[in-house]
Amino acid sequence: MAEFDFAEEINSEYLEEEYLTDAMTGGQDKRRQLYYQLIQSMKKAESVDIIVSFLMEAGVKMILQELENTLKRGARIRILTGNYLGITQPSALYLIKRKLGDRVDLRFYSEKGRSFHPKSYIFHYTDHSEMYIGSSNISRSALTTGIEWNYRFSSKKDPENYERFFQTFEDLFENHSIIIDDKELKRYSRNWHRPAVTKDLDKYDIADQETEDTKIKPLYEPRGAQIEALYALEDTRAEGAKKALIHAATGIGKTYLAAFDSKPYKRVLFVAHREEILRQAAVSFRNVRNSEDYGFFTGDEKSTDKSVIFASVATLGKSEYLNEQYFAPDYFEYVVIDEFHHAVNNQYRKIVDYFHPQFLLGLTATPERMDGKNIYEICDYNVPYEISLKDGINKGMLVPFHYYGIYDDTDYTKLHVVKGKYVEKELNETYIGNVRRYDLIYKY
């Protein structure tokens, strides 16, 4: 599932000079929220330095666009954050790397023997600098409605104390930090488990979002593992890859991931084995693309002129449709194969072999097959990102659950076997007729 977020339109009255303040205390009055003051300072700054204990995904999303605007003006941005206890979310770091790349000097505080709890935002102008210092890390609630105390002062008014703070930042950044490059980010993400304290932080951010009273418009954005996977997919394409397999547990949001990743492409094909999946996928793509320009290629519908086509394997895999009369091999720029572990089957393979898109994405939660057939060769053994069920639970993206092993007394001995398989009609009747089986399922 994708995150349903909001694109915020800041009312210009809050940005007038008379509403600027040096003391920010949070709460519902936007004039007392740190976020609106930071945006004003960022719009004028020639360089920006940020030092905070942790970064949260929701907070980064709020300031990301203004950070990019600042970079476009030629400004320098440095960010120093902590990794202690794993409060900094990997997705927050991936957001920065994906959107801003190496234009931002992003680092972890590296000393393990000292605590790291600073929260300061420093803006440098032509003839002076100003510093915000207080209690706000980069989370949505801390930047807006949370009770956070922050104070702004200028290097002109208090040069001695400004210099003391700034030189401390310089020392920490240059001598007590490690650069967050791709290798370090992957290492941090791989080892990251969602700490209990972030459950409250996430709760505050969500509550703040739900009570938002600014002018808003609905927006679907990637979240969590989707952000990490998108970064990995963009990286693998930059290296020249034409195919990739994403192995992600059910519930991570693979369909939305495909919708986000394929958004820049004009003609997209989404293939699945059940029409129900196609209909659900269409909703995801419509939300992400904000477009009704999509159609279906199934037993009852044969759309060929839409930007996004959702096709059933059973229909598209027929020879009568895999030809120039319906679709040229290079018609689709981007092809998604859902349930990619089925791709070794005949009809799936016909589709995969026929089309030659700019990029092919396979999605699966279960890459291993009981028959030993290899699905990895179909995607050139390229798996840029994977997240298991266990990892999804540990990272707080999926809920934990309990397995129940329940004895099923269904009697298969009277069923006929043809070519190594039970007769499907008899099997269905046996299951449907076993009322005790239903009782067991409902009981547990």
Positions of PLM-derived features:
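Conserved helix-turn-beta segment of the N-terminal RecA-like "Helicase ATP-binding" lobe
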Residues: 268, 276-301
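PLD/PLD-like phosphodiesterase catalytic module centered on the HKD motif
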Residues: 1-223, 227
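Walker A/P-loop
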Residues: 238-261
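Walker B catalytic acidic pair
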Residues: 338-339
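Pre-Walker A adenine-sensing motif
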Residues: 226-238
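Conserved helix/coil segment N-terminal to the catalytic DExD/H
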Residues: 299-331, 345-350
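Conserved interdomain linker/interface between the two RecA-like ATPase lobes of SF2 helicase motors
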Residues: 383-444
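Post-DEXD/H (motif II) to motif III coupling segment of the RecA-like Helicase ATP-binding lobe
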Residues: 342-403
